[in-house]
């Protein structure tokens, strides 16, 4: 099998180098777009009927990126730009012959999913370094999506800038009107009379799953590749100055506990705290937080894990989400699972302010300083976590420095420190990213951990190579984690392991694709994973994920099948969902079938069923989700997961375990929303409720009313149910000085 894979890899590599003709380099002459200066502030209402808009110099020569790369779009798009001493204004007309009938928007969630919605977005590179971008996106209902991108690799999706957008819809299409304050943008100080910035516009028409751009890029890339961006010229921004944002909050809460040891039956509290954000200049930002609270953060979703390895729960707390990309370097799988499943992150913010079960631990104060420029990026963060009877007072520190090399490469270092009364854990890391050309890239890292308690030192490292074009994605990830490596403020999916995880995706859109009105591409793949125990060199896991059948549909739906022959050597027993499996060698084969519909429709679904052998028995798994969104103001999602064990483990266990949930989002508009979530897990007999009313009464100022409820089996008495109820009211106010 090893020789077969090597042969396939060599043959496909030869094919990719000899046949790929659709990847193109950035144009040496960048496409230009001119902004026009005005004196007055505009009324931002989505109509573009202020007389000043007639002074603008419109651009409409967009190019289609997907599916007909390089062709003239079937739907006209026009962009205009104005500016004054306070704002950069952008107006976009998105013509559509079907008018309102073609609009696809499923909900009003901020930072919405562009794969399920019409959208238009601006990528702005204020330093004009062709690497970094601030992205401002909206959909036909004026929902905001904004984030920061660095080398199209690290993304701060949860960065929330202060800006406005309004939209209107008509029988001829839809209009978006943006007003972005200069204080929100990051740009270099210049002595020139005018400035030119990197700039691109990306439009998605979801009904036909088409994508257009002002300055074109290959369809295997995205608009974040600023080396393909055009230029917006004629800008006269004010000199960058320091500005301060203060955001105090007031919170009152009521807590009730039943059958939980160490807790009062009832408790009430009033809490005051807040954050200060000081933009020292256009490059540097200092954030201060005191008596930090995350009551409005989404509750974690339960997961029934049947693998031997740790599940990475996403960070949901706003303070840690901002500038996460600077500190969050690491090696891990991409969203399409390319790169392999191995994950190494020297810093992972959920290790701060949360216990092992995800319950909050109070944070007294914290500070974060970040500076980004065309050449260097550096930052530091300090957090003081409050001590309690169950955990000592703990201090956390993380520092990061990286330097941009050449056009698209980077070298960096990171250090983390966790200090409490019993131990100090230190992790030091060096890492780099090299983009050899448009298709080839290499990401690597080396780090060492040390614990003063016991004087224990460990090491980890990884290198991840990618070759990505319109037709192929090929990767090889090599990783090593020693037995004693301990990133106390980080995350690893496995320990004491040497990982080898190559793979191939083939994206075929040629003339032999059948039923082209339905099928957009055929995408077979091969994902191979080998893991050896680092301390002994013994093979402990081997799997071949073979998918000869995978179809991407013109609608955005998909269907496919993956077969995965697997070898596992368990060095110790483990118990997935309470089913004990002894140590030893196991060979088994899993099959997975996937089917997903058009996610932009009013009713859509995703289903995958897994079946086959599992260690010494069988396991069938069903995952099903359905979205019902009759109008964008109302969306309801149901999810169901069932694991059926048959004669598995020491006791030949046969049982069903169900995990299901329902989530509803009800919005009067993008700024006033009620979100409810309920989840039940038959494995732990747990019921979780989360209901949150959110009103953004002015930009980035919120009123929240939150109710959380947890019911679960008591850990001390098996015949007793424990219960937690939390009712929270919180108001925050943002003031920009």
Where are these regions (language model features)?
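Exposed, low-structure sequence patches enriched in small/polar residues
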Residues: 362, 370, 437, 442-737
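Extended, well-ordered alpha-helical scaffold/bundle regions in very large, multi-domain proteins
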Residues: 285, 291, 299-302, 314-316, ...
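A short, polar/proline- and glycine-enriched secondary-structure boundary/capping micro-motif
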Residues: 99-107, 145-148, 187-189, 297-299, ...
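Structural preference for beta-rich elements and adjacent junctions enriched in aromatics
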Residues: 19-397, 402, 412
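Alpha-helix capping and helix-loop boundary segments enriched in small/acidic/polar residues
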Residues: 263-264, 307, 357, 387-392, ...
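Extended, hydrophobic alpha-helical segments in both membrane/secreted and soluble proteins
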Residues: 248, 270-276, 284, 290, ...
């Amino acid at each position: 099998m090893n020789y077969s894979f090597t042969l396939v890899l060599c043959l496909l590599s030869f094919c990719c180098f000899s046949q790929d003709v659709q990847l193109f380099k950035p144009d040496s002459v960048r496409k230009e777009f001119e902004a026009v200066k005005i004196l007055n502030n505009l009324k931002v209402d989505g109509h573009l009927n202020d007389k000043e808009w007639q002074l603008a110099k419109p651009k409409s020569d967009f190019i289609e990126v997907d599916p007909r790369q390089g062709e003239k779009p079937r739907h006209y798009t026009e962009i205009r730009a104005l500016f004054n001493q306070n704002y950069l204004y952008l107006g976009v007309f998105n013509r559509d012959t079907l008018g309102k009938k073609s609009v696809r928007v499923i909900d009003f969630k901020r930072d919405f999913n562009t794969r399920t919605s019409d959208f238009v977005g601006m990528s702005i590179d204020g330093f004009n370094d062709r690497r970094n971008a601030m992205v401002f996106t909206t959909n036909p209902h004026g929902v905001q999506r904004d984030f920061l991108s660095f080398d199209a690799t690290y993304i701060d999706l949860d960065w929330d800038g202060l800006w406005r957008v309004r939209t209107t819809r008509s029988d001829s299409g839809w209009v978006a009107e943006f007003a972005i304050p200069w204080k929100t943008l990051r740009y270099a100080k210049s002595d020139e009379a005018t400035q030119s910035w990197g700039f691109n516009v990306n439009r998605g028409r979801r009904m036909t799953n088409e994508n257009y751009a002002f300055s074109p890029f290959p369809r295997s890339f995205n608009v974040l590749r600023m080396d393909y961006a055009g230029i917006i010229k004629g800008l006269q921004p004010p000199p960058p100055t320091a500005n301060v944002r203060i955001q105090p909050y007031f919170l009152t809460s009521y807590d009730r506990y039943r059958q939980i040891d160490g807790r009062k039956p009832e408790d009430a509290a009033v809490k005051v705290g807040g954050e200060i954000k000081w933009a020292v200049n256009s490059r540097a930002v200092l954030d201060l937080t005191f008596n930090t609270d995350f009551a409005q953060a989404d509750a974690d979703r339960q997961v029934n894990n049947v693998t031997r390895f740790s599940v990475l729960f996403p960070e949901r707390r706003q303070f840690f989400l901002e500038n996460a990309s600077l500190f969050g370097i690491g090696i891990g799988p991409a969203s399409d699972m390319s790169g392999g499943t191995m994950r190494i992150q020297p810093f992972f913010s959920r290790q701060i302010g949360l216990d092992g079960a995800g319950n909050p631990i109070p944070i007294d104060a914290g500070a974060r300083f970040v500076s980004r420029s065309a050449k260097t990026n550096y930052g530091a963060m300090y957090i003081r976590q409050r001590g309690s009877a169950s955990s000592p007072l703990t201090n956390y520190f993380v520092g990061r420095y990286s330097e941009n090399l050449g056009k698209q490469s980077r070298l960096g270092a990171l250090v983390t420190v966790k200090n409490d009364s019993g131990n100090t854990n230190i992790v030091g890391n060096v890492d780099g990213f090299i983009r050899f050309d448009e298709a080839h890239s290499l990401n690597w890292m080396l780090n060492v951990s040390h614990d003063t308690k016991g004087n224990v030192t460990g090491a980890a490292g990884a290198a991840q190579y990618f070759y990505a074009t319109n037709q192929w994605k090929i990767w090889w990830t090599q990783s090593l984690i020693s037995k004693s490596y301990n990133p106390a403020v980080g995350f690893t999916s496995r320990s004491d392991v040497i990982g080898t995880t190559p793979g191939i995706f083939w994206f075929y859109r040629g003339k032999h694709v059948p039923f082209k009105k339905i099928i957009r591409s055929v995408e077979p793949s091969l994902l191979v994973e080998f893991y050896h125990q680092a301390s002994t060199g013994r093979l402990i896991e081997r799997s071949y994920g073979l998918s000869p059948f995978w179809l991407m549909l013109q609608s955005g739906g998909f269907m496919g099948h993956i077969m995965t022959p697997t070898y596992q050597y368990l060095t110790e027993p483990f118990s997935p969902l309470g089913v004990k499996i002894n140590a030893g060698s196991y060979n088994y084969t899993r099959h997975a079938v996937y089917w997903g519909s058009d996610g932009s429709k009013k009713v859509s679904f995703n289903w995958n069923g897994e079946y086959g052998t599992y260690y010494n028995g069988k396991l069938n798994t069903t995952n099903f989700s359905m979205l019902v969104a009759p109008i964008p103001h109302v969306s309801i999602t149901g999810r169901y997961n069932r694991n059926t064990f048959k004669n598995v483990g020491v006791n030949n266990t046969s049982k069903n375990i169900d995990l299901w949930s329902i989530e509803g989002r009800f919005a009067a508009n993008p700024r006033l929303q009620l979100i409810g979530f309920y989840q039940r897990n038959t494995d732990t007999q747990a019921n979780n409720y989360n209901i949150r009313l959110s009103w953004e009464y002015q930009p980035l100022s919120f009123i929240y009313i939150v109710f959380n409820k947890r019911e679960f089996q008591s850990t001390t008495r098996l015949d007793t149910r424990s219960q937690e109820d939390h009712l929270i009211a919180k108001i925050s106010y943002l003031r920009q000085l």
